[in-house]
Amino acid sequence: MGLNIQIVVDAARPHELADWWAETLQWAVEPQDADFIRSMISQGYATEDQTMTHRGNLVWKDGAAIRPAEDIESKAPERRILFQRAPEGKTVKNRVHWDVRLDGRDKDEVRRELEARGASFLWSARQGPHSWHTMA
């Protein structure tokens, strides 16, 4: 049996980043169970300050995960990206970057869509037959 993977991304605003990437990848933000969270608080395992309201839902403040929607619906083994709150800011260059595969879509069209949602265009590049936009 193969192993599954969770990629963890440190973020100042994990819930907003999870929303953005879920929309970009056409994945879903993993639901959090407000009743379970309230239960953990009432039993003394968690405190109110460890929670927040995001888009009208009670969630854990420190993180949000995204998964392919079909994995959530089918309860498939977890492949997920977890965005977790990091108190410190970034201090050095990112050691990981994400290549968003376009599956035949026009890269300029996708660039415009991502910019409209808050991404920043940095530069375009080409190597042999491959070309891309670098964005942040």
Q: Which ranges hold each PLM region?
A:
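Vicinal oxygen chelate
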Residues: 2-9, 19, 23-25, 31-32, ...
